[in-house]
Amino acid sequence: MLRSHAAGLLREGDAGQQVTLAGWVARRRDHGGVIFIDLRDASGIAQVVFRDPQDTEVLAQAHRLRAEFCVSVAGVVEIRPEGNANPEIATGEIEVNATSLTVLGECAPLPFQLDEPAGEELRLKYRYLDLRRDDPAAAIRLRSRVNAAARAVLARHDFVEIETPTITRSTPEGARDFLVPARLHPGSFYALPQSPQLFKQLLMVAGMERYYQIARCYRDEDFRADRQPEFTQLDMEMSFVDAEDIIAISEEVLTELWALIGYRIPTPIPRIGYAEAMRRFGTDKPDLRFGLELVECTDFFSDTTFRVFQAPYVGAVVMPGGASQPRRTLDGWQDWAKQRGHRGLAYVLVAEDGTLGGPVAKNLTEAERTGLADHVGAKPGDCIFFSAGPVKSSRALLGAARVEIANRLGLIDPDAWAFVWVVDPPLFEPADEATAAGEVAVGSGAWTAVHHAFTAPKPEWEDRIESDTGSVLADAYDIVCNGHEIGGGSVRIHRRDIQERVFAVMGLDKAEAEEKFGFLLEAFMFGAPPHGGIAFGWDRTTALLAGMDSIREVIAFPKTGGGVDPLTDAPAPITAQQRKESGIDAQPKRVQQA
């Protein structure tokens, strides 16, 4: 071993011991010929002092030290002189009086100082330096503890950890695949899996009964600020269970995870129906740390002469004290709405005397003006924001406005935790809505799956898949924490006939379903058990636990929001020879024979 002790674990009780430490120079200070360094390793920091004037060789070496040199130091642990203790660090009562010094690796001029802020792109380009800093390193170490805690819970319940393939067949699952040319089969491609969904279902058919995996997943999505092309899930599947069983295990996992940061999740976690969440909060990922619920106004304005409110849906959200906002701020709300694809955000100001002002108020009837504040629960001094139009998009705008209002008014306690299960979502959604939202619709039909094509309908809706498609409810559940969906799952279809009916609704005829999912349909013919599961977004979950806004902070080597790795400069072009060898331009054999 190149060291005998961890620097950050030395204490007063170690005084008098001869130790060998190894790590990096966090700081170097020269005080009249006596040199001090803060030596940092994974355990923390210890002060090392070079003060022996007789040992000129060691002193000369110490004079050469600069920040981030990697060194090994031998010496004796001593109590610091009176008045020199540092209560800011765990080792602040001691120091190591060095007797030898070995430079293990010199450090070039740093691209940024590790104790100063740096831009994200620079941090990612030199991520190996960024991870020497306390907060980034702590986030990665927390992730390891999170993994271990989840594994411990699942081991207690006899889950089997199984690795599924990471190169497989391209199957439509709701996003674009990353494709990998198969050199030995020119013109054919593997795909990186968007999830282990199909394989974990096959494992249930295989009799594994309880499976889990900390799985890498890949989706070729459009660039978004806080998405990664590769991400991690805690993936679980169970046989002979219903939704209640899966929710119970999931709550046990979550309880164990949040215990790592000293918080006890009250269980059972409350539940809300999807339809109720959309009606009250405008989203299926409601942040319940604050109120400000949406108010339905469609019936209130049913006879309105104001053309903007002659819409399928009219809703409102109240901003407490918002009537005092200057005109420039109110105009800024319009820009805020336009950035989200809407024409604007109508508003009414409630004056201190209860009269209504703003551009909308003059278009309302006397009866509407008289009853509006009471209907939406507004008080003098408040601002009422409205959205009118299609139900889903109008509610979504108000839901976003609700969160924006809470942020601007400081209504969200950053130390609070609010968990909720969102249950009973629709099984299908219009395919055009899915594609407009940037998703990839499975099949060519008018409907596509809200979650994925393998989600089972609630048993009472099974007979109405074709006759009342838009109303069918899924036997599915999402877990939401502080407005973030951190996991989602469902009971799965385990019968071939039902799976084929669901495919048909989505525009996959029997021949196409057989071509793309024949292996799954065939497996269902061999005594497939009822089964279901859940997958947790492991990056987001860990980021919440670490108190980080971005998932990039809990990924060792993340990509930027544009999908680029500044460290390795990926993605990168390939050579002409690589392209030729890959067979990427070849026609597959079955096409050549046709």
Curated annotation (Swiss-Prot):
Q: Which residues bind L-aspartate?
A: E173, R219, H451, R492
The record lists ATP as bound by: R219, D220, E221, Q228, E485, G537, W538, D539, R540
InterPro entries noted in UniProt:
Aa-tRNA-synt_II, aa-tRNA-synth_II, aa-tRNA-synth_II/BPL/LPL, Asp-tRNA-ligase_1, Asp-tRNA-ligase_1_N, Asp/Asn-tRNA-synth_IIb, AspRS_core, GAD-like_sf
**What is an example of a Pfam family matching this protein?**
tRNA_anti-codon
**Primary location:** cytoplasm
Cell compartment(s), UniProt: Cytoplasm
- Reaction(s) the record says it catalyses: tRNA(Asx) + L-aspartate + ATP = L-aspartyl-tRNA(Asx) + AMP + diphosphate
Q: What is its EC number?
A: 6.1.1.23
Which stretches does the entry tag as region Disordered? 566-594
Q: Name one GO cellular component term.
A: peptidoglycan-based cell wall
Q: Which GO terms describe its molecular function?
A: aspartate-tRNA ligase activity; aspartate-tRNA(Asn) ligase activity; ATP binding; nucleic acid binding
Q: Where is this region: Aspartate?
A: 197-200
Q: Does the keyword Hydrolase apply?
A: no
Q: Does Glycoprotein appear among the keywords? A: no
Which Gene3D superfamilies does the record cross-reference, listed alphabetically?
A: Bira Bifunctional Protein, Domain 2, GAD-like domain, Nucleic acid-binding proteins
Q: Which domain of life is it from?
A: Bacteria
Keyword annotations for this protein?
Aminoacyl-tRNA synthetase, ATP-binding, Cytoplasm, Ligase, Nucleotide-binding, Protein biosynthesis
Site positions per UniProt: Important for tRNA non-discrimination? H31, G83
Q: Which family does it belong to?
A: Belongs to the class-II aminoacyl-tRNA synthetase family. Type 1 subfamily.
| HAMAP family per UniProt | Asp_tRNA_synth_type1 (MF_00044)
Q: What does this protein do?
A: Aspartyl-tRNA synthetase with relaxed tRNA specificity since it is able to aspartylate not only its cognate tRNA(Asp) but also tRNA(Asn). Reaction proceeds in two steps: L-aspartate is first activated by ATP to form Asp-AMP and then transferred to the acceptor end of tRNA(Asp/Asn).
Oligomer status and interactors: Homodimer.
Can you say what this protein is called?
Aspartate--tRNA(Asp/Asn) ligase
Name the encoding gene, please: aspS
